């Protein structure tokens, strides 16, 4: 085997785009939290920065239009190609901040396709095919030159806790996003939001800003994300490397 040569360089942090996941049970405040984060990021990017919102919830995509300034693409189909086309539409129009609300519909689409393609009990090939389709959108999000906030419904479970009257009562909690296994680890920060308190806990945090904190996600959180991501050397083009 011929000798392989490597170039050894000093590691330096480079500026990157924010890529985060907000998950939680239905009613926990994922969409609202995503809009607050996006508003904080957009303010840091600069005056006139527009927020693009890729929605899958029909009329619910417009619930907060009186509180936040954002432009909307409502998806009518939930295949990876539709998600990717919507991202490209915003990128081509110059948007620097994008919300995808939510990715759960994509995962439901994947599961539906597997069911349709399965013959007998052999789901292995179908899962292999459509998990690759699912991975396409993840790669698109991670490589897109824009700050992207993704939401996903949590895998709901119920726990018994004492209520305000001291009686044990069931409470719905999210235990990971309704997405492919370990998908939360693809993002810079992944939060799980509590349904009752709307408080978010970072279950994975590359920034170390949110570790050990349980808080409401707001514009200040978005500003902190942007500042961390923008702290570093400008990314060089391939020709400059």
Region locations from a protein language model:
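Short, conserved acidic/polar surface loops in the N-terminal third of protein domains
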Residues: 65, 108-114, 160-162
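Phosphate-binding/switch region of NTP-binding enzymes
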Residues: 25, 139-223
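Amphipathic alpha-helical transducer elements in NTP-driven molecular machines
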Residues: 31, 76-84, 97, 124-143, ...
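Conserved P-loop
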Residues: 2-97, 104-105, 109
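C-terminal regions of RecA-like/P-loop NTPase motor modules
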Residues: 1-6, 14-20, 27-28, 197-241
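Glycine-rich, phosphate-binding/catalytic loops in enzymes
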Residues: 70-71, 114-118, 166-168
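An acidic- and aromatic-residue-enriched active-site/binding cleft used to recognize and process polar
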Residues: 56-58, 103, 153-154, 196
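Conserved P-loop NTPase nucleotide-binding/switch module
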Residues: 100-130
């Amino acid at each position: 085997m011929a000798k392989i040569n490597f170039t050894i360089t000093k590691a330096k942090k480079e500026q990157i785009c924010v890529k985060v996941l907000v998950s939680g049970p239905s009613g926990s405040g994922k969409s609202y939290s995503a809009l607050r984060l996006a508003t904080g990021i957009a303010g840091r990017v600069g005056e006139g920065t527009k927020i693009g919102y890729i929605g899958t919830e029909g009329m619910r995509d417009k619930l907060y239009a009186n509180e936040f300034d954002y432009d909307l693409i409502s998806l009518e189909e939930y295949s990876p190609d539709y998600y990717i086309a919507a991202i490209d539409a915003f990128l081509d129009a110059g948007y620097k901040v994008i919300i995808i609300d939510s990715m759960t519909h994509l995962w439901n689409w994947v599961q539906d396709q597997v069911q349709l393609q399965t013959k007998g009990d052999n789901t292995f090939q179908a899962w292999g095919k459509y998990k690759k389709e699912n991975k396409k959108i993840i790669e698109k999000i991670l490589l897109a030159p824009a700050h992207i906030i993704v939401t996903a419904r949590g895998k709901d479970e119920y726990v018994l806790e004492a209520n305000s009257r001291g009686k044990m009562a069931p409470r719905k909690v999210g235990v990971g996003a309704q997405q492919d296994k370990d998908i939360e680890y693809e993002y810079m920060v992944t939060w799980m939001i509590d349904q009752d308190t709307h408080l978010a806990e970072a279950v994975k945090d590359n920034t170390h800003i949110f570790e050990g904190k349980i808080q409401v996600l707001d514009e200040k959180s978005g500003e902190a994300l942007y500042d961390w991501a923008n702290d570093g050397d400008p990314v060089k083009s391939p020709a400059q490397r």
